[in-house]
């Protein structure tokens, strides 16, 4: 299977690419320069012949959220997804599936356990970003199966949030970040 991936150079994307190749799939990395160009012709050419597309693009959220960085968070997700969807929709033979990342920030921190369909949408910048991001992905051609994945914090010994979280523990210090009543949604890289 030929799988196109945005964000293939990021933490999740690089591991996913290696795993897919290990299982014999061909990975087509969709690099930033394809999204920086006017129009989507080159992007559509890169997608031609792909059976699946995985959208993991987006600036890291583990930075200080200045107004300028918030704009980068939005643009790196919304504009990339918009161009990706436009390119997929232009194909005569689009991929059978598009998997597009989102985040558990959609749900906020209302406490308690919720199912994905009955959880209330949060009233926050991150929730608004997730809604807009998912809305852009939802514009993909209806012949393409759309899967939205709301990731939590990614934990792995070799990257993601875990090494940063473990740093204070090396000095014998542990603490709860934020309100201890809030849930901590996480996913293991593997």
Question: Where do the protein language model's features map onto the residues?
Answer:
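NAD(P)H-binding glycine-rich loop region in Rossmannoid oxidoreductase-like domains
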Residues: 34-83
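Glycine-rich NAD(P)-binding loop of the Rossmann-fold in SDR/ketoreductase-type enzymes
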Residues: 72-80, 124-128, 132, 187
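Glycine-rich "substrate-gating" loop/helix at the edge of Rossmann-like oxidoreductase active sites
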Residues: 121-126, 150-159, 179-187
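A conserved pocket-lining segment of Rossmann-fold NAD(P)-dependent short-chain dehydrogenase/reductase
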Residues: 164-187
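N-terminal Rossmann NAD(P)H-binding glycine-rich loop of SDR-like oxidoreductase domains
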Residues: 3-22
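Conserved Rossmann-fold NAD(P)-dependent oxidoreductase catalytic core, especially the SDR/UDP-sugar
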Residues: 82-124
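Conserved beta-loop-beta element that borders a ligand/cofactor-binding pocket
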Residues: 102, 135-157
